[in-house]
């Protein structure tokens, strides 16, 4: 499920920067220099137009009915999550918001603006005052490629995202807590397509998003750590635009391995990207584990519902698969399975209490290698969870 767009945004940002640096000629950069990397009103217009007939707003009645259901569902869900994880939430979840696809676009443009504003500042600082290809890249390169790319992708996601727990990553003035959002037209369409009763499917989605809320609200250090990883990734990508062409040639020649996005990164960038991927895998895997355990108690026919939903993900069309490959979102889908295998393996080996060590702080988070081989993480914890830099990769 494509849910938390702070995490989705990282993949799209990386793909966008790579495409920019690898495909635009120096002369064109110089000739078309302007003032901003992205024209956000243009991006918004492209995304909204991509929705076409699916842009219909929610009526006041539809919104009120859905909101009442989600509020009641979350009241029932919270005790089940608390029972499963063995600890209470610090406080009740904020009132959720029910939104339509157009509202989702506007909500998430703020996340992308925060990401790209950091890129813009760093590229301008690196370019200095001289009118160089680097400065031109910092100022306008994506007003042709980037506007179209981001507008297309945000419009694409606006029809796919069912719900998200928004923690305002990189926001200038983030609130003390995140908020749950449900994209009701997508939830309704998915329920109908899967032939699942709407209220049962709503509860299914609300349960997953509530587990993400627990992860962040019960462990306040997590948001700062996640934000720092994203900021580090952005800085590394923005301060080395000149090497993209060389790495592109190496990737095409087969000299580099891994996903195409990873093949276009420096070793330092790949290390940071790996830490980010590991955290995303853990968050999704833990959420899925809790959801599966609590769902059996909360939702009639949960196992069948879950299987139908998973089969839906497996039946993606060729165009959708290509889009996910190009943007790096296919990496996100792979994370669900890897993270859940890690969580299940640790619980099977040492029990749920031992798994709770993941929440002690950044030093006890598993690395990407440890996500793939849980025995390595277990061994590191039993050896004293040395420093955050030891045993990580």
Regions found by a protein language model. Give the residues of each.
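Hydrophobic alpha-helical topogenic segments used for membrane insertion/localization
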Residues: 5-29
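N-terminal mature-domain "stem" immediately C-terminal to a signal peptide or N-terminal signal-anchor/transmembrane
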Residues: 29-84
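Short, solvent-exposed segments of well-ordered alpha helices
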Residues: 61-64, 68, 197, 270-274, ...
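Auxiliary, metal-adjacent structural segments of Zn-dependent hydrolase domains
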Residues: 73-185
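Post-HExxH zinc-binding segment in Zn-dependent metallohydrolases
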Residues: 147, 151-165, 216-299
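Short pre-active-site segment immediately N-terminal to the catalytic Zn-binding motif
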Residues: 187-205
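Active-site recognition of the HExxH zinc-binding catalytic motif
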Residues: 201-220, 343
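Pan-zinc metallopeptidase signature
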Residues: 271-393
């Amino acid at each position: 499920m494509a849910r938390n767009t702070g995490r989705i945004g990282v993949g799209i940002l990386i793909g966008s920067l790579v495409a920019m640096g690898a495909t635009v000629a120096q002369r064109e950069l110089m000739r078309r220099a302007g003032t901003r990397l992205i024209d956000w009103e243009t991006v918004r217009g492209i995304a909204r137009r991509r929705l076409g007939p699916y842009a219909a707003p929610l009526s006041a009645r539809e919104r009120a009915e859905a909101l009442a259901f989600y509020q009641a569902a979350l009241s029932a869900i919270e005790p089940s999550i608390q029972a499963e994880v063995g600890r209470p939430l610090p406080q009740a979840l904020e009132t959720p918001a029910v939104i339509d696809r157009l509202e989702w676009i506007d909500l998430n443009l703020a996340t992308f603006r925060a990401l790209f504003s950091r890129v813009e500042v760093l590229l301008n600082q690196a370019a200095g005052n001289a009118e160089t290809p680097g400065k031109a890249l910092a100022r306008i390169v994506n007003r042709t490629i980037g506007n179209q790319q981001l507008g297309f992708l945000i419009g694409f996601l606006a029809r796919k995202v069912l719900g998200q727990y928004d923690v305002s990553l990189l926001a200038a003035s983030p609130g003390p807590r995140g908020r749950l959002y449900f994209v009701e037209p997508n939830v309704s369409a998915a329920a109908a397509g899967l032939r699942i009763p709407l209220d049962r499917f709503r509860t299914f989605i609300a349960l997953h998003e509530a587990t993400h809320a627990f992860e962040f609200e019960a462990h306040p250090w997590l948001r700062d750590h996640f934000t720092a990883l994203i900021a580090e990734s952005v800085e590394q990508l923005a301060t080395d635009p000149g090497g993209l062409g060389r790495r592109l040639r190496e990737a095409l020649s087969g000299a580099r391995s891994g996903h195409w996005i990873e093949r276009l990164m420096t070793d330092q960038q790949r290390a940071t990207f790996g830490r980010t991927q590991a955290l995303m895998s853990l968050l999704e895997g833990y959420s899925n584990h809790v959801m599966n355990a609590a769902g059996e108690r909360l939702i009639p026919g949960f196992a069948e519902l879950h299987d139908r939903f998973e089969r839906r993900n497996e039946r993606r069309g060729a165009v959708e698969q290509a889009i996910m490959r190009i943007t790096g979102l296919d990496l996100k889908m792979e994370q669900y399975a890897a993270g859940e295998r890690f969580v299940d393996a640790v619980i099977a080996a040492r029990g749920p209490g031992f798994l709770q060590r993941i929440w002690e702080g950044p030093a006890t988070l598993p690395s990407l290698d440890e996500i793939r081989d849980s025995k390595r993480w277990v061994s590191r914890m039993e050896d004293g969870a040395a420093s955050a830099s030891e045993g990580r990769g």
